[in-house]
């Protein structure tokens, strides 16, 4: 128990001195390196959980004093409440703060600063001592070079130079050297001043070659002025394939056939050591050649080529530079190479003479189809413009200092050209007529390549029964020329050949030469028979009108055209092939109205009350456009159409009429035409009744006075009449023979009317017996009259004078009398006459 007491006390004191470590956390590098005169930068962080830092002391090699319960040692830095720093503490700077940063800087640092630095930290309730190791050397310590595990030639590697020192107040630089010479590659330098590490590092990337093997690489530490401070060196171990060199006897490697050649392979470097040896010619390994010496005895031209030796190690095979062995020999049989073959006519061609020879040929002899080409001694022959005769076989002979070669088989030059001398040949017998079948062939003289097709122009729906033959069915008149082309890769056209097709005249037509305007009656007219073409050109003309031959000249002339010359004209043109008719051409003659006449419908005699139509008929071209009507007095009537319609027609309308027609050419008039209008039966009856009534009244008075005196005469007269008559009643209308028509000239008496002539009208008055009824019409009276043997009849006649007033458009000079004269015809019946009544019936006739 007595032994444990002091130790327990020591532990308690230690605990009190260091407080609770779980409440303080520090981060900083464990060891820092520097050298005399340099500086030290101590990056440091801390965390005090119970409050801010109140006191900080930096000790050098601190030791805890148990007696005083404090740390003893050299105080390099101590913070004071008034902020004053002792003079000896100026090289040490506390760069931290009161809660987390405890960074320090010592500048300059001395050798005796090596050891342990103690950071005494105190807060209000806690205390802590943190220790940091400082290693200060007398001289600058060297950097350390780091190499990759293996270095191979031509593979990029990174060399690293590391120095465990860095301080803001003391700049340094790291320099790379190869065999004491600064390296050209740029290095990348970096520094670290963190709580984890403090260093300066330089990295260099380069691709080592086999020649770098065994070379010394140096990393040199320099101050800011480039002054050497220290360095580190390493020897490069570059793995590489064997590096070889060939030696040849003879040294120029030029021999003639039959000579001997020796080649020796020497290894200048290999890392690691080589294992196998081989020889190659033109990239191909030579069999059974596994030594460093290659002996070639009695070489031939085939042994010419590129030789090299190959030695292998664990890295790979290494090859020497190639040695070109030239075995000289005379030219071999030559061959000809033709550039641009087959050649097109007109293009350029180049010939190349190829002959294996060593040395190269210096002179050439050229042959065309076995004949030497004079002046051609070069390796190449150039023809700027090739022609068909250049085609053929070309060969050559080469010559060098060792001899002359032999002529090879040669090369064939194919000169291609379009078909030559192409012609179109007509196979038909001449001449060719329109509608014939024509056969043509396309011929040519030569062609290379052969003709494969033919073309024809103009194009048409024609038949090609065989290649180069054209058959034209039903040849047209206008097939003037035909041309053909023979084609291979190109087409050559022949000159057009004229078919000279003979045909009948074409496009025959009638053309009016004069007059240039409309044709009027009386004009001089010329018609021309035209046609567009005819082959042969000798032609004849024929004129036709309505199928009647007129003439045989090319022109048809009318000195004075008349309407009768109008009609449909056509002309014919013929040659030895045939004839062609023109289309019918209508000759139209314009003339004034002529041959006018007035036609009447239904006739020239019309009963009053009916209708009469007078038509003015004419012959005119152009047709009549205007009509004018005139009466017998040349008075113009207010009618201007072709037809004059009278409805109802009156007796006053009787007379002579004429018409006049007008067109754009002129006028024409018709002769007089007479219209006769006669009375209707009703009018005649009325007028006869009136006339007879008047006559009867006068006659009765006369009869009464002369009754007895003339009784016997009437009896005798009546008996005479009975002997010659059937005793029937009758009415006589004397028709007067029509007068000769008046002259064509107009007259003042109007139109002749036969009804207006002097005439005698008869009527019979019948006196019936007593108590027998009487009718007023003639027909009933006739049917009811007694037999002739018992009928007493008196026949009266009325003579009418012609009156001037009966003519239209004529006014009488003085009043006229009735112009009626009466007479009596007495018919005595057979037997005794019955007692008659005393009354008398009258018939009066009036116009």
UniProtKB/Swiss-Prot annotation:
How is it modified post-translationally? Answer: Phosphorylation of Tyr-762, Tyr-807 and Tyr-822 are involved in binding to SYK, GRB2 and SYK, respectively. Phosphorylation of Tyr-842 is involved in binding to SYK, PLCG2 and PIK3R1/PIK3R2.
Q: Where is this motif: ITIM motif 4?
A: 840-845
**Start and end of every Ig-like V-type domain?**
20-138
**By its UniProt entry, which SMART domains does this protein fall under?**
IG, IGc2
Q: How does it sit in the membrane?
A: Single-pass type I membrane protein
Q: Which residues cross the membrane?
A: 688-706
Q: Which GO terms describe its molecular function?
A: carbohydrate binding; CD4 receptor binding; IgM binding; protein phosphatase binding; sialic acid binding; signaling receptor binding
As stated in the Swiss-Prot or TrEMBL entry, residues carrying the post-translational modification Phosphotyrosine are 762, 807, 822, 842
Q: Note the superkingdom of the native organism.
A: Eukaryota
Keywords linked to the UniProt accession = Cell adhesion, Cell membrane, Disulfide bond, Glycoprotein, Immunoglobulin domain, Isopeptide bond, Lectin, Membrane, Phosphoprotein, Repeat, Signal, Transmembrane, Transmembrane helix
Q: How does it assemble?
A: Predominantly monomer of isoform CD22-beta. Also found as heterodimer of isoform CD22-beta and a shorter isoform. Interacts with PTPN6/SHP-1, LYN, SYK, PIK3R1/PIK3R2 and PLCG1 upon phosphorylation. Interacts with GRB2, INPP5D and SHC1 upon phosphorylation. May form a complex with INPP5D/SHIP, GRB2 and SHC1.
Q: Which family does it belong to?
A: Belongs to the immunoglobulin superfamily. SIGLEC (sialic acid binding Ig-like lectin) family.
- What name goes with this protein? B-cell receptor CD22
Q: Give the encoding gene's name.
A: CD22
